[in-house]
């Protein structure tokens, strides 16, 4: 396995930002600031801890650091005496409150950091960049927009931006990624510094250029990207703006320096310092009692859960550490090292391991409990094979893992193979094949001696994400057989809403160890696993195998408690894994020349649309700029602002807003079409040729089996599930998908499968009869809604829209918008539909109630989707029967209302996913006797490439197999088409 775990999360907290928000949130409230009966201020302590608890609960970080400002001046104050000179004097009660907060954080053993001469932002910036380089996913909790400049998808850094009152909502923050920053600021994260350099920042007394405001700064950066390029192109800028820029260059450069966060502060901390290692209850509880924060005393077990690296709660009075807190890190001062009693530690690994790299030699400090055997001689391999032959009990399968130098199985070299067959320290082995140093066995010897174990089904195996290992081994001439358990898929079936990487599974099942991610190895950009010494790679791979072996028994035991889920895993998901591996290997041909022509056509169309939009607006502007577009729509054209929402830089122009504005002005249709075509061009037409494999001349999409909570497959590299089909251009993209030369491309598509499933689940008489009699169900609906037998194509289309829309909870307004009728007419149609299909709506409501009462709903075959509601009134209804529930007086938040809509739809969508997966498993057996190969699965459609001579015989067999995949109360119908490309086969 090239990368065995998701990156651990490093949470960085802007201490003063959160503390001040807590202080003013309560200080400005009607009840005033919080105080104890003795008069001690506690607004900061209460608000800070409450918010931090919520973030820890939702984000579950592996490490945390909290940065604070110091009182003395920083290098920015020395460079500019006016810097932050407008800040008010810190209130006395805030300082006192903050001192108690520091004590609480020390009692919780959380690392607080300051550094002389630098601000908290610089500490956060340094830790964020260093954390990213060390393999962490980084999230920064702050209400300071300055930190937006650190956001980076490449570095895996985002900001949890505090809301105006972070103590009045469920989470108190909005997570902003790259696009989130653009939406909020109108510029990219990389442009934040130059944005402030141009227009300044009054809150920090950063001057910027006199006469240049935010709008002008955004416009300049949209056109020239950076401050440096603005000045490089100064000759092209005319009038007063050029004069302001010319006169203000020194101010701009000075402001740029003030605004830029330092990312190389020499902090005296290690990653070990930032791990969540537990805390002393004896120290924390008296402090909480003194501050009269009794609500937190009642939640002491939650504190242990959130601040102890997900370790089991420690009983009060029997602590897991020595009671000594981590000290606040300050510049130029030594820090006392805390070494908790090893015998009391509940985890072998807490977070990221220590990685040493000196003179090119990389080693990892791993526990002595794992002692992998490094197999480098034929005699050692023969002895290992003899040992492995003893393990034929499927209840105790041998765990396997591969190590490669690439994530792409088509090009990856097999660097090593690992296995674990017991819980003893030395019942782990690593077989190196292609490291750059050390004695190793050849691939030929491995195939001769180990091949009989790997390929023979009598030797049961367990793997984490077996599809990857299967493909890697296959490309090296080694068959993988006898996989009785895939831990990733088992976790997915049991808990589809959770993550399923090895690190998270180790934590969730309390293995007492945490698998390492590839980034934990400390390899440089040009290095791979092959650069590791054999012992180091053996430790890394061995830990993966050992963890997988331990997980197997725990997952099998849990599966035994849920027979229907076990059957889904054994009969659907695990057989499908092998099928998907073959589909990924096969790939599909792409017509690159055609896509180049289509790209040129799209470019011309986009230019035409832009010209039309400029004419409608009366001026040219950047259609891709939310800020500029908002100005045109709501300021110049005067469109209804109530249909949008206020953002930091103006009004939202997202897709939902534009849909609401459709019909209000012709420019809206132009903008929507422009966005659709631009996305098609960038995401598919221009991107697909770049993904063609040089050796196979095909694209090899990845089918993701353990991602969606509904049970559906997803795909990536490229994402073929999202190719739209409504527009002419989107349909033309499918023309680029080709079969093997002189073969046919065949499409087998389930017709109206979700409506048929709805008919089966709801037992709605109208739908049952319509499908049973092979009638046009959309026509039937239209006839019932309009009260007449003869309907027009437009009326049938209205019936189709409402039939499919009701599955996804479509309301009257959206129905009216999509069909072009008035809101009043839309409401009348929806009401009429409710009366006509009463049993459908009874069923949908029952599913919502089941989700509340049981916490989950199920598909036809028993797949579960779980729902965790936030609204307390809903949570209190858990455990009751459906007939006992009454939601009339229940007030719920927007997210829970959305969850209920998903609960109504989940059995339908999930059953659809189950049916096509069952069909794929059955078809794979059918196709063993033919040359035809399954290539793609997209929604309810399967794509094959087929020799023309097999069409007459095989097409009916494929159709029948799919239609008989699962027996419903109504017939399943599959439509078969063939052609020389995908578009022709639709």
Curated annotation (Swiss-Prot):
One of its GO terms (biological process) is double-strand break repair. Keywords: DNA damage, DNA repair, DNA replication, DNA-binding, DNA-directed DNA polymerase, Exonuclease, Hydrolase, Nuclease, Nucleotidyltransferase, Transferase. It comes from the Bacteria. It is an enzyme of class 2 (transferase). Pfam families: 5_3_exonuc, 5_3_exonuc_N, DNA_pol_A, DNA_pol_A_exo1. Residues 593-986 are annotated as: Polymerase. GO terms for molecular function: 3'-5' exonuclease activity; 5'-3' exonuclease activity; DNA binding; DNA-directed DNA polymerase activity. Residues 308-327 are annotated as: Disordered. Its EC number is 2.7.7.7. SMART domains: 35EXOc, 53EXOc, HhH2, POLAc. Residues 1-303 form the 5'-3' exonuclease domain. It catalyses: DNA(n) + a 2'-deoxyribonucleoside 5'-triphosphate = DNA(n+1) + diphosphate. Transmembrane segments: none annotated. The keyword Membrane does not apply. Residues 304-592 form the 3'-5' exonuclease domain. In addition to polymerase activity, this DNA polymerase exhibits 3'-5' and 5'-3' exonuclease activity. Belongs to the DNA polymerase type-A family. Single-chain monomer with multiple functions. This is DNA polymerase I. It comes from Synechocystis sp. (strain ATCC 27184 / PCC 6803 / Kazusa). The gene is polA.
């Amino acid at each position: 396995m090239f990368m065995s775990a998701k990156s651990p999360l490093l949470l960085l907290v802007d201490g003063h930002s959160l503390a001040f928000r807590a202080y003013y949130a309560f200080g400005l409230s009607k009840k005033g600031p919080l105080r104890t009966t003795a008069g001690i201020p506690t607004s900061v302590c209460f608000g800070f801890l409450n918010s931090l608890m919520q973030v820890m609960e939702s984000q579950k970080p592996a490490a945390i650091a909290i940065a604070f400002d110091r009182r003395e001046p920083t290098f920015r104050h020395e460079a500019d005496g006016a810097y932050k000179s407008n800040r008010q004097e810190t209130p006395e009660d805030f300082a006192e409150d903050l001192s108690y907060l520091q004590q609480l954080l020390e009692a919780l053993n959380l690392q607080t950091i300051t550094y002389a001469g630098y601000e908290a932002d610089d500490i956060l910036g340094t830790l964020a960049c260093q954390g990213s380089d060390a393999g962490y996913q980084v999230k920064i909790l702050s209400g300071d927009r300055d930190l937006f400049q650190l956001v980076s998808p490449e570095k895996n850094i985002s900001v949890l931006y505090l809301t105006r009152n972070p103590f009045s909502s469920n989470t108190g923050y909005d997570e902003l990624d790259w696009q989130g920053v653009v939406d909020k600021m109108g510029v990219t994260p990389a442009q934040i510094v130059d944005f402030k350099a141009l227009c300044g920042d009054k809150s920090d007394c950063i001057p910027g250029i006199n006469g240049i405001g935010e709008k002008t700064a955004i416009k300049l950066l949209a056109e020239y990207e950076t401050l440096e390029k603005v000045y490089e192109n100064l000759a092209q800028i005319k009038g007063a703006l050029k004069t302001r820029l010319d006169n203000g260059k020194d101010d701009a450069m000075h402001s740029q320096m003030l605004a830029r966060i330092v990312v190389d502060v020499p902090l005296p901390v290690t990653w070990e310092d930032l791990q969540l290692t537990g805390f002393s209850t004896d120290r924390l509880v008296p402090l909480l009692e003194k501050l009269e924060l009794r609500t937190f005393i009642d939640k002491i077990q939650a504190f242990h859960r959130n601040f102890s690296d997900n370790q089991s709660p420690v009983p009060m009075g029997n602590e897991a550490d020595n009671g000594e807190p981590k000290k606040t890190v300050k510049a130029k001062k030594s820090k006392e090292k805390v070494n908790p009693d090893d015998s009391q530690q509940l985890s072998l690994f807490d977070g990221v391991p220590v990685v040493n790299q000196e003179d090119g030699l990389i080693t990892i400090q791993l526990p002595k409990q794992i002692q992998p055997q490094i197999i480098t001689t034929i005699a050692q391999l023969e002895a290992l094979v003899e040992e492995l032959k003893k393990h034929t009990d499927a209840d105790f399968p041998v765990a396997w893992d591969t190590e490669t130098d690439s994530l792409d199985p088509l090009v990856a070299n097999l660097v090593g193979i690992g296995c674990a067959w017991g819980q003893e320290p030395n019942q782990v082995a690593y077989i190196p094949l292609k490291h750059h140093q050390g004695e190793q066995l050849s691939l030929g010897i491995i195939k001769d001696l180990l091949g009989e174990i790997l390929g023979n089904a009598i030797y049961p195996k367990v793997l984490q994400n077996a599809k990857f290992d299967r493909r890697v081994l296959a490309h090296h001439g080694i068959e993988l057989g006898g996989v009785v358990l895939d831990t990733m898929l088992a976790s997915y079936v049991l808990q589809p809403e959770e993550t399923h990487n090895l690190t998270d599974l180790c934590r969730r099942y309390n293995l007492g160890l945490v698998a390492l991610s590839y980034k934990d190895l400390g390899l440089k950009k040009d290095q791979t696993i092959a650069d590791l010494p054999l012992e180091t790679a053996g430790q890394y791979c061995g830990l993966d195998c050992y963890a997988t072996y331990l997980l197997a028994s725990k997952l099998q035991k849990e599966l035994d408690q849920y027979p229907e889920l076990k059957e889904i895993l054994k009969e659907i998901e695990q057989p499908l894994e092998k099928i998907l591996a073959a589909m990924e290997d096969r790939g599909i041909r792409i017509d690159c020349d055609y896509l180049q022509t289509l790209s040129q056509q799209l470019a011309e169309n986009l230019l035409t649309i832009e010209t039309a939009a400029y004419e409608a607006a009366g001026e040219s502007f950047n259609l891709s700029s939310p800020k500029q577009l908002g100005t045109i729509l709501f300021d110049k054209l005067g469109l209804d602002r109530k249909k949008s929402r206020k953002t930091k830089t103006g009004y939202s122009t997202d897709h939902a807003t534009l849909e609401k504005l459709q019909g209000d002005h012709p420019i809206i249709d132009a903008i929507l079409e422009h966005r659709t075509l631009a996305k098609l061009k960038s995401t598919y037409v221009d991107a697909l040729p770049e993904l063609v494999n040089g050796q196979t001349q095909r694209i090899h999409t990845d089918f993701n089996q353990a991602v969606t909570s509904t049970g559906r497959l997803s795909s990536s590299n490229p994402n073929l599930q999202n190719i739209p089909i409504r527009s002419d251009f989107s349909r033309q993209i499918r023309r680029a998908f080709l079969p093997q030369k002189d073969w046919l491309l065949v499409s087998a598509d389930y017709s109206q499968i979700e409506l048929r499933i709805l008919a089966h689940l709801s037992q709605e008489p109208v739908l049952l009869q319509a499908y049973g009699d092979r009638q046009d169900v959309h026509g039937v609906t239209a006839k019932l809604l309009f009260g007449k037998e003869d309907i027009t194509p437009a009326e049938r289309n209205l019936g189709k829209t409402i039939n499919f829309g009701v599955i996804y909870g479509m309301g009257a307004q959206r129905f009216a918008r999509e069909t072009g009728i008035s809101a009043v007419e839309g409401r009348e149609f929806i009401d009429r539909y409710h009366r006509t299909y009463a049993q459908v709506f009874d069923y949908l409501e029952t599913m919502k109630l089941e989700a509340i009462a049981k916490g989950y709903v199920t598909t036809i075959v028993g797949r579960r989707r779980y729902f965790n509601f936030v609204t307390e009134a809903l949570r209190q209804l858990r455990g009751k029967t459906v007939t006992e529930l009454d939601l009339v007086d229940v007030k719920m938040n927007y997210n829970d209302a959305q969850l209920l809509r998903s609960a109504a739809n989940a059995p339908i969508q999930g059953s659809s996913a189950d049916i096509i997966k069952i069909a794929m498993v059955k078809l794979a057996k059918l196709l063993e006797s033919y040359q035809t190969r399954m290539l793609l699965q997209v929604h309810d459609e399967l794509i094959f490439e087929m020799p023309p001579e097999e069409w007459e015989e095989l097409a009916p067999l494929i159709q029948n197999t799919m239609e008989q995949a699962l027996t419903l109360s109504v017939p399943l119908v599959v439509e078969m088409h063939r052609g020389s490309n995908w578009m022709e086969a639709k």
